[in-house]
Amino acid sequence: MESNDAINKEVFGHPVGLFVLFFAEMWERFSYYGMRALLVLYLVEEIGSENPGLGWSAEDAGSLYGSYTMLVYITPILGGIIADKVLGYRKAITTGAILMSLGHFALAFNPMPAFYLGLGLLIIGNGFFKPNISSIVGQLYPDGSPKKDSGYTIFYQGINVGAFLGSILCGYLAENMGWHYGFGLAGVFMVIGMIQFYLIQNMFGNIGLPPKKGNLPETNDVLDSIEEVKKQPLTKVESQRLIVVGVLAFFSIFFWAAFEQAGSSLNIFASDSKFWDSLSLKQAISTFFFVNIFFRFFLNSSSLFE
């Protein structure tokens, strides 16, 4: 059996593999939020300005942003299924990282076909990367481990740090050198995350490998199990829990609808506001995007090393 240094070695009481995934996810979120902070502003910036954009209307830019975000949330479902059935988590993560790197670099070019190609690659790559790196985090801990929750809290801080740095640095570069330099920087850090994970992934041993054919259940056995589950009615406790899940899911719709305004309408509002000029602050308005990320970092930091 392969040794599993990712689990056997610990740092701050947690498997060392957690911190490998922490940095891989941090650089991926750097690239994602860095690009996301620029997207709508690039779309609405006038073609004839000093830092020319595409000259879209705010409505069209918001529509594209909404479609992009919707697909970014949908594709992880498909990416998770493909990883479970075919690729395994590690190959799915590497595949997603490659696609997203290519997507960011495609955005760094001016022709419109490259722009749409870049968005498509980012959507597909995110579907492979995002759900599967989180799944590996869960497999670093035995079932019922009290450390798993705090492990995910540490992992989530990588998301916050990456988003914080990405929105600031990509925004600064886009404002002072040009939009495509900002998109290119996002690609550079995505490549860093990809290389880091690829070179160190063997430390995870058997975790995240493609499923073996012998371990896959026969189709008839699966169908029989499904039929057996169907015949069993939900208990009272299960029904109550499903109701709670439904209520939370309903209200989460409004939360995410408001949250996603940070990358669209709030960005445009901040860009058009005269407040910045009155203070003589000619800085990348896209860096305003990091405020909610900064707040979330402290909101989730209380249980880091429990």
Please give the residue ranges for each predicted region.
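Cytoplasmic membrane-interface "Motif A"-like loop-to-helix N-cap segments
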Residues: 85-97, 144
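Intracellular loop-helix junctions on the cytosolic face of multi-pass helical membrane proteins
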Residues: 1-20, 143-144, 171-281, 299-303
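Intracellular juxtamembrane helix-capping segments at the cytosolic ends
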Residues: 128-142
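Short amphipathic helix-loop junctions that connect adjacent transmembrane helices
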Residues: 37-60, 262-286
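C-terminal ends and interior cores of transmembrane alpha-helices
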Residues: 95-116
